[in-house]
Swiss-Prot record:
S4 RNA-binding domain span: 93-153
Gene3D superfamilies per record: Ribosomal Protein S4 Delta 41, Chain A, domain 1, RNA-binding S4 domain
Molecular-function GO term, any one: rRNA binding
Subunit description: Part of the 30S ribosomal subunit. Contacts protein S5. The interaction surface between S4 and S5 is involved in control of translational fidelity.
Name of the protein this chain belongs to: Small ribosomal subunit protein uS4
Organism, scientific name: Latilactobacillus sakei subsp. sakei (strain 23K) (Lactobacillus sakei subsp. sakei)
Family: Belongs to the universal ribosomal protein uS4 family.
Coiled coil: none
């Protein structure tokens, strides 16, 4: 399955969650798209709830179904912790997500582009793989020739706070994942137990 490239705002409203992370999609119309969007939702089946939760998390991080399923399988092999929480932590460790969390991009999609186009380095070496798994302590920075990109400057200026599991040096446009996040620091709108149930049915 290919990555979803359709209208993100309508999809965000349908799923009831901001896929961009900005919250703008739901600010004016916090209901599903359509003439009577806020009156159309009937009772959702258990399977429907599980599927919806899986789609929310997958699309929030911009993964294809295959990528998401593979990551779910990896999370299941981690001996410590809960399966669903481990999945969310692995998603947070993706390089494109760390670039987003550091405030070097306004959205995860924009962060993925920065990585794809070779603007990001890990421990001084260019890495152009968005799914690269960042380990605590690794230094993430912007290449010297890319530091004047307008989209990066705009993203930094528009960033209001950063999660406590990352550190950022605004003067040198670099930062790091200082530790793995706790569940309480991750998306509160997601019920990861439903995702585990979806794949284990």
């Amino acid at each position: 399955m290919s990555r979803y490239t359709g209208p993100k705002w309508k999809l965000s409203r349908r799923l009831g969650i901001s896929l961009s992370g900005t919250g703008k999609e739901l600010a004016r119309r916090p209901y599903a798209p359509g003439q009577h969007g806020n009156d159309r939702r009937g009772k959702i089946s258990e399977y429907g709830m599980q599927l919806s939760e899986k789609q929310k998390l997958r699309l929030m991080y911009g993964l294809t179904e295959r990528q998401f399923r593979n990551l779910f399988a990896r999370a299941g092999k981690i001996r410590e912790g809960k399966h669903g929480v481990n999945l969310m932590i692995l998603l947070e460790q993706r390089l494109d997500n760390i670039v987003y969390r550091l405030g070097l991009a306004s959205t995860r999609a924009q962060a993925r582009q920065l990585v794809n186009h070779g603007h990001v380095t890990v421990d001084g070496k260019r890495v152009d793989i968005p799914s690269y798994e960042v380990k605590p302590g690794q230094e993430i920075s912007i290449r010297e020739k890319s530091k004047n990109l307008v989209i990066i400057k705009d993203a930094i200026e528009g960033t209001v706070g950063r999660p406590s599991f990352v550190e950022f040096d605004a003067d040198n446009l670099k930062g790091s994942l200082v530790r793995l996040p706790e569940r309480s620091e991750l998306e509160p709108e997601i019920d990861e137990a439903l995702i585990v149930e979806f794949y284990n049915r």
